[in-house]
Design a protein with these regions (language model features):
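Short, glycine-biased loop/turn motifs at secondary-structure junctions and
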Residues: 1-113
Length: 113
């Protein structure tokens, strides 16, 4: 089973779309998984989380998605049937994860000058 590491934003109460989450818990969605419509959602690119949750009013966690998977065509948003909420990383953590994500994509051996 494919497991995808990612990041999820929440409101101040650790809710998303009215669903209450808790760090360290795993959740399962019954039914069809369709990105932007149904299933549990998260982003692979930490910076994409800011499209959905503003930095000044949100909380952020590392997550792992698995089960049925559907991907968005516009950004790194993923929908899944199983979502494990990892540790809360806060704003500094999501920014650091974003920098590391970008640096991980750089191909320094073939850098253009």
């Amino acid at each position: 089973m494919e497991k995808i590491k990612g990041y999820k934003g929440f409101d101040q109460n650790l809710k998303c779309q009215g669903f209450q989450y808790e760090a360290g818990k795993k959740y399962e969605h019954e039914g069809k998984v369709d990105c932007c419509n149904s299933g549990f959602h998260f982003c692979e690119n930490p910076m994409d989380v800011f499209y959905y949750y503003a930095p000044s009013t949100s909380r952020y966690c590392e997550v792992e998605g698995s089960g049925d998977i559907d991907r968005d065509r516009d950004d790194s948003k993923v929908a899944c049937s199983e979502l494990k909420i990892g540790r809360e990383i806060g704003l500094n953590g999501i920014i650091e994860a974003g920098v590391n994500f970008i640096l991980g994509k750089a191909d320094w051996a073939n850098a253009k000058e």
